[in-house]
């Protein structure tokens, strides 16, 4: 399978415990995970933040006053996908622990999820759209060698 091209900027905010998140997100793996979810070439920035920055961004842009796992800011979908993906490290870490997943596996899923959002996929418009997006995410994760992220 031919994968699309990706120009990636990978950024880590400064926060306690950031090194564990750097270790879970080697650049080559992040590139691989995102490229598997792309249907077009892309320029994507991935930023790993603390709870304070994650909450501030979610409050400002989604009017929800809490830190969420991933925020997608899509700027263009054609001819090149241009987006920022912001992942909140404490939320991702907590969810991985609660779901009995390795940290890198949960990051892989959220990067796939965010990359699909950057290309116009939406799970909040209808149950049918949510099912379709989840099925596609599951297929991508299995291509990458991971288990179904939605399995109980």
Curated annotation (Swiss-Prot):
Metal-binding in keyword set: yes
GO cellular component: cytoplasm
Function: Single strand-specific metallo-endoribonuclease involved in late-stage 70S ribosome quality control and in maturation of the 3' terminus of the 16S rRNA.
Stretch forming the signal peptide: none
MF (Gene Ontology): metalloendopeptidase activity; RNA endonuclease activity; zinc ion binding
Entry protein name: Endoribonuclease YbeY
PROSITE patterns: UPF0054
HAMAP family found in the cross-reference section: Endoribonucl_YbeY
One GO BP: rRNA processing
Lineage: Bacteria, Pseudomonadati, Pseudomonadota, Betaproteobacteria, Burkholderiales
Record-stated family: Belongs to the endoribonuclease YbeY family.
Swiss-Prot/TrEMBL cofactor(s): Zn(2+)
Keywords, ordered alphabetically: Cytoplasm, Endonuclease, Hydrolase, Metal-binding, Nuclease, Ribosome biogenesis, rRNA processing, Zinc
Binding site for Zn(2+): 113, 117, 123
Cofactor comment text: Binds 1 zinc ion.
Keyword check for Hydrolase: yes
């Amino acid at each position: 399978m031919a994968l699309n091209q990706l120009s990636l900027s990978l950024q880590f905010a400064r926060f306690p415990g950031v090194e564990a998140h750097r270790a879970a997100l080697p650049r080559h793996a992040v590139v691989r995970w995102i490229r598997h979810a792309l249907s077009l070439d892309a320029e994507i920035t991935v930023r790993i933040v603390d709870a304070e920055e994650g909450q501030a961004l979610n409050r400002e842009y989604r009017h929800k006053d809490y830190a969420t796992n991933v925020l997608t800011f899509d700027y263009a979908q054609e001819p090149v996908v241009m987006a920022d993906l912001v992942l909140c490290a404490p939320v991702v870490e907590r969810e991985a622990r609660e779901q009995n997943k390795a940290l890198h596996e949960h990051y892989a899923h959220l990067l796939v999820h965010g990359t699909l959002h950057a290309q116009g996929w939406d799970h909040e418009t209808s149950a049918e759209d949510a099912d379709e997006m989840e099925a596609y995410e599951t297929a991508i994760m299995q291509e990458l060698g991971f288990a179904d992220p939605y399995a109980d």
